[in-house]
Amino acid sequence: MNSIIITRAGTHSTIQDFGRFQYQHLGVSPSGAMDQRIITELQKIIPNHQNQFLEFAYVGPSIKVKEGSVKICVGGNCNMSIQKNNNSQLECQPYKSINLFAGDELIIHNTIDSVYGYIAFEHGLGLEPCLNSYSTDTKAGIGSINRPLNDEDIFHISKDVSSWDLISIPKPDLEKVTNFKV
């Protein structure tokens, strides 16, 4: 079993996906990622069929692998590093897949020139959907965990890193706004 622990939750870190649009007629907010362009780009690097993403604002979370291994990718312009199990520290870049192993910790310091950043996990976070979506609406208390993340939250990921190939794409030009969510 693979598991991660949130060692620092960051600013308003929540679980999001592309949104729940089938319940708006009942007054349920669609929620979903604030910047869907970024999670669309992350899907190209880390196919995440459950569409579960960790969204954070300004100050990102720190995530430590408790057991096993996990393949992730961070989206958005962020300062981040990896504290390896042997206490060495590696700088890393967004839009590149990263293999983390037991004891490794991803530290996202902050976003740069943007509000939101995202983390994609290769096999999702092992969560159950709520109203056919993983998105969190903190005001309504709806979502897979129906609240922002807290320090010491643990997620169990069902599979090991499936391939050792590290994948990257050119940093997307997100300045071109074609459509956006209000």
Summary of predicted features, one role per range:
Residues M1-V182:
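Conserved "landmark" site that anchors the functional core of diverse proteins
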